[in-house]
Amino acid sequence: MSTAIQPAGTAGGGGSDSNGLADVVDTILDKGLVLDAYVRVSVVGIEILTVDARVVVASVDTYLRYADAVNRLDIVNEDPKSDLGGLVGDVAESATSGVAKGKTTGVLEAAGEKLGDMLTSDEPEPRKATRVRSRRADR
C-alpha cells in the first residue's frame, strides 16, 4: 500500500485558494485593524511621559470613520491648565505680572509727581551767584 501526500495549496474540495490572500487583505482594509495605545505617566500631577501610538491597517474611509467614532482625530484634546503644572504656571505668572505691574505703576506715579512738581513750581529756580571782581581791587 502506498500513501501520497498532497501539497497544501492543491488540497481538493476546499474552494478557490488563489484568492485567499486577496480576500484577507480586502476584509482587513474594509473592516480595519487598529491598534491604539495612549499612555501617560505623571507624578503628583506633573506629566513626565506621554506615549501615543496608533497602528492602523485600514482604508482611509475606514480609519476616518473609526477616528470620528472614538474622537481620536485630534490626539491631544485636553486643557493644558487642568493639571497641577498648569495651575502652578498660572500662579507663578500672575505673581510675576502682579510684581511687574506694581513696579511699573510705582515708577509712573513717581515720574508723574516729579513732572507735576516741576510744572507747578511758582518759585524761580535759585541762580548761582557769581562774583564780579573789580579791576581796582586787583591793582
UniProtKB/Swiss-Prot annotation:
Region feature Disordered, mapped onto this chain: 113-139
GO cellular component: gas vesicle shell; vesicle membrane
Segments forming a coiled coil: none
Entry keyword Magnesium: no
Subcellular compartments: Gas vesicle shell
Top-level lineage group: Bacteria
Keywords of the record: Gas vesicle
Bias type Basic residues, positions: 129-139
The keyword Signal belongs to this UniProt entry's keyword annotation: no
InterPro entries reported for this sequence: Gas-vesicle_GvpA-like, Gas_vesicle_GvpA, GvpA, GvpA-like_CS
A GO molecular-function descriptor: structural molecule activity
Pfam families: Gas_vesicle
Function of the protein: Gas vesicles are hollow, gas filled proteinaceous nanostructures found in some microorganisms. During planktonic growth they allow positioning of the organism at a favorable depth for light or nutrient acquisition. GvpA forms the protein shell.
Family of the protein in this entry: Belongs to the gas vesicle GvpA family.
Quaternary assembly: The gas vesicle shell is 2 nm thick and consists of a single layer of this protein. It forms helical ribs nearly perpendicular to the long axis of the vesicle.
Protein name: Gas vesicle protein A
Organism this protein belongs to: Mycobacterium sp. (strain KMS)
